[in-house]
């Protein structure tokens, strides 16, 4: 196993980044169970496997830091990427709960919650082997919702600073931190923003338009 091999080679394991993640999205009514299962298998189980490999080693040596990559979508609701958002919320919960257990053993745990980062995930869409559903143009949608994507190099600098400071939740860039704080302070404002973005996306991408239902007797 990679973790054990690194520990044998170097005699210590100081820092582990669990960075598994794929984008899975679309209107929930269009998704199949396979969409949900794939998101869970990669985005959540991938992190669980990383923790299961690294945590025992760090317990034995009495130090180390595990950084689990979630997303700002793990702190704030994210319509039309609901499976992704769900799994990233789970990664935050895993990280903060484990952090409470690990502290007494000298092991640190952080949840990394970046905003939109300029990587290939913005252009990939759903995995090609899953049933085809209408989904978003990731790059266009997130730019509208969250502003221009953040460079991976700038994120790396912010992450290492957060690790050095032992932050429980590392949120970057600044606009992502502001969005999170707004959600904590005034969640109804974020909800209204989400509703507007959902209406725009339904029209823009043809995502399961709302059909009026006749409820008259």
What is each residue range found by the language model?
Residues 76, 97-108:
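Active-site-adjacent segment of SDR/Rossmann-fold oxidoreductases
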Residues 27-28, 35-40:
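Substrate-binding pocket helix/loop in short-chain dehydrogenase/reductase
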Residues 31, 77-85, 97:
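Active-site loop-to-helix junction immediately N-terminal to the catalytic Tyr of the SDR YXXXK motif
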Residues 51, 87:
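Active-site helix of classical SDR
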Residues 71:
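Residue(s) in the substrate-gating loop at a strand-loop-helix junction
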Residues 104-174:
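SDR active-site lid
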Residues 1-11:
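Conserved amphipathic alpha-helix within the SDR
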């Amino acid at each position: 196993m990679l973790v054990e091999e690194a520990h044998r080679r170097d005699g210590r394991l100081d820092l582990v980044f669990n960075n598994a993640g794929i984008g899975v999205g679309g209107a929930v009514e269009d998704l199949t169970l396979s969409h949900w299962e794939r998101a869970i298998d990669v985005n959540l189980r991938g992190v669980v496997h990383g923790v299961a490999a690294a945590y025992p080693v760090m317990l034995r040596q009495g130090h180390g830091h595990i950084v689990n990559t979630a997303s700002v979508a793990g702190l704030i609701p994210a319509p039309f990427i609901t499976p992704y958002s769900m799994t990233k919320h789970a990664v935050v919960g895993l990280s903060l709960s484990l952090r409470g257990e690990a502290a007494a053993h000298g092991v640190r745990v952080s949840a990394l919650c970046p905003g939109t980062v300029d990587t290939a995930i913005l252009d990939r869409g759903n995995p090609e082997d899953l049933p085809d559903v209408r989904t978003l143009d990731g790059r266009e949608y997130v730019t509208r919702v969250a502003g221009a994507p953040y460079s991976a190099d700038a994120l790396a600098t912010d992450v290492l600073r957060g690790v050095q400071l032992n932050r429980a939740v590392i949120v970057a860039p600044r606009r992502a931190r502001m969005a999170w704080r707004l959600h904590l302070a005034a969640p109804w404002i974020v909800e209204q923003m989400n509703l507007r973005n959902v209406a725009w996306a339904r029209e823009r991408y043809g995502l399961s338009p709302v059909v009026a239902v006749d409820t008259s007797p």
